[in-house]
């Protein structure tokens, strides 16, 4: 009577064992299939529509290419770099041409695309300036690295950009002491833009075409675009961001907006900053992560897209399933150029941000006024006296109503806040000092408005902090950095680049805090 149950248990056990083996085999198969599927997906889309702008140029269609080595930089001391200039066949030398700067050399098959788009009338007559990053070679000339300097310019359709170093244009191998690419490209400041403005473009202006025509390049920022891939892309964005007086149109391919040298900070800086007159085309791949140590490129580009959209920029964002290469960026390059130059010569204009602090501060203006909100101004003798008086104590300010006092220090990202033990009295003593206001750039001068918001003149413009010590808005300085400032009513006067400028705001400055009404609380949120 027991035997059948024993057999039954044995049969069930065997069946369970077979089932477990089957499940295990299916699981392994599923893992292999999933891995194969993911491997297949982590590549660029298989096909792209062939754009006519990639059609090979006939000899009769081509313009002129000028190559040279640039040395003796004062900004990037000791560096050497290769530069290519392309002059389209339509250029006559009689009037200034537009400009396209491409970082890491000739990427995206750019010369062919440029010439075809210019010939078809889809792009204005544009001189191409292709700039490699700098390297410093050993004086001894000993053989060392065998790859070419700035080999990002040689990147194929599926190659990574900006890897490599070490051969002169003559082909003689040299030992590289320093690669300057990351230092030049990944920095979040206007240094590379200044390098282009003060050193590269003046040098290009000395060149002539084979027919003797001078190279005339428009100084109008609306006639200038800049592009790059990877670190070159963030460099292109930074050049336009910090110097919209130089560049207004940006193409970014697989941009390195990650934590290399502060690029990860851009999304929240963009959200807080008064919009600039820029038009931006972003490209990236879902699987873009050159080195996860620094962050996720795809995630960073999505944050950039979100921030730029919030801040009201003219923006186009395109992606595929690829990784960190320029295959997709190359395929999109013709459309990116068409989109960036569409409507030319109409000016690129400022959009309207959804930042509520900016909306509260800025008056409604036409697009042209938003692009140039500051006007040069001269002061009356009385205004000059007020300006100089305000600048005698640039690092202290008392809030309206006399309830708190802000004290800043040169070079510090923190501003101390003190509370009054006898609020509203000029004879009060100040107590409870704490690091309270946190800045994005060190202060040059501080002042309150009548609503109790703290204004901070700084290198990145005027930071505006709320009652709780947070920067909520950043007003662009007329020349970038703002050294000094003064409110006269709702007229804000600043010194920027050694010149005086003014603009009107909806806010008014606090002039006599102990006689002014205590502002409405902003709560603790």
Tell me what each language-model feature is:
Residues 486-525:
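Blade-level signature of beta-propeller repeat domains, shared across WD40, Kelch, NHL, RCC1
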Residues 417-426, 505-511:
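Short loop/turn segments immediately following beta-strands, especially the blade-tip
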Residues 432-438, 471-475:
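A short beta-strand motif characteristic of beta-propeller blades
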Residues 22-35:
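Bacterial N-terminal signal peptides
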Residues 41-156, 160-357:
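Non-catalytic cap/lid and distal C-terminal segments of serine-dependent acyl enzymes
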Residues 413-415, 462-463, 500-501:
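Structural signal for beta-propeller blades
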């Amino acid at each position: 009577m027991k035997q059948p149950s024993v057999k039954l248990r044995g049969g069930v056990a065997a069946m369970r064992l077979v089932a477990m083996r089957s499940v295990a085999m299916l699981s392994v198969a599923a893992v292999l299939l999933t891995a194969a599927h993911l491997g297949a997906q982590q590549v660029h889309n298989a096909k792209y529509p062939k754009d006519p702008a990639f059609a090979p140029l006939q000899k009769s269609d081509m313009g002129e290419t000028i190559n040279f080595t640039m040395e003796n930089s004062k900004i990037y001391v000791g560096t050497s770099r290769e530069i290519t200039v392309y002059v389209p066949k339509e250029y006559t030398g009689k009037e200034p041409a537009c400009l396209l700067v491409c970082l890491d050399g000739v990427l995206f098959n750019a010369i062919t695309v440029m010439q075809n788009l210019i010939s078809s009338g889809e792009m204005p007559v544009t001189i191409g300036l292709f700039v490699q990053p700098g390297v410093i070679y050993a004086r001894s000339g000993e053989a060392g690295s065998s790859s070419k300097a700035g080999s990002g310019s040689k990147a194929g359709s599926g190659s990574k950009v900006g890897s490599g170093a070490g051969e002169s244009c003559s082909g003689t191998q040299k030992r590289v002491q320093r690669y300057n690419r990351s230092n030049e490209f990944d920095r979040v400041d206007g240094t590379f833009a200044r390098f282009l403005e003060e050193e590269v473009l003046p040098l290009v202006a000395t060149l002539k075409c084979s027919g003797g025509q001078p190279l005339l390049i428009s100084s109008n920022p609306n006639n200038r675009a800049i592009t790059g891939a990877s670190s070159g892309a963030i460099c292109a964005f930074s050049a336009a961001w910090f110097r919209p007086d130089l560049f207004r149109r940006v193409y970014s391919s697989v941009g390195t907006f990650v934590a290399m040298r502060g690029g990860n900070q851009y999304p929240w800086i963009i959200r807080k900053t008064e919009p600039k007159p820029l038009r931006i085309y972003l490209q990236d791949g879902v699987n873009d992560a050159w080195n996860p140590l620094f962050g996720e490129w795809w995630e960073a580009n999505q944050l950039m897209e979100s921030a730029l959209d919030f801040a009201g920029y003219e923006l186009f964002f395109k992606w595929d399933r690829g990784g960190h290469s320029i295959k997709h960026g190359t395929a999109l390059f013709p459309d990116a150029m068409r989109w960036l130059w569409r409507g030319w010569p109409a000016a690129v204009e400022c959009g309207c941000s959804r930042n509520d602090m900016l909306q509260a501060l800025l008056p409604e203006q036409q697009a042209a006024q938003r692009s140039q909100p500051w006007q040069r101004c001269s002061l009356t003798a009385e205004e000059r006296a007020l300006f100089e008086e305000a600048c005698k104590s640039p690092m202290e300010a008392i809030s309206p109503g006399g309830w708190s006092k802000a004290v800043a220090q040169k070079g510090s990202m923190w501003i101390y806040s003190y509370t009054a033990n006898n609020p509203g009295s000029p004879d009060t003593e100040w107590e409870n000092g704490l690091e309270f206001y946190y800045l994005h750039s060190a202060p040059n001068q501080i002042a309150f408005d009548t609503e109790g918001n703290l204004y901070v003149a700084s290198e990145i413009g005027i930071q505006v902090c709320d009652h709780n010590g947070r920067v909520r808005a950043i007003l662009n300085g007329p020349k970038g950095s703002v050294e000094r400032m003064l409110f006269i009513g709702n007229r804000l006067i600043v010194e920027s680049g050694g010149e005086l400028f003014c603009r009107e705001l909806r806010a008014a400055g606090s002039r006599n805090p102990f006689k002014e009404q205590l502002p409405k609380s902003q709560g603790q949120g």
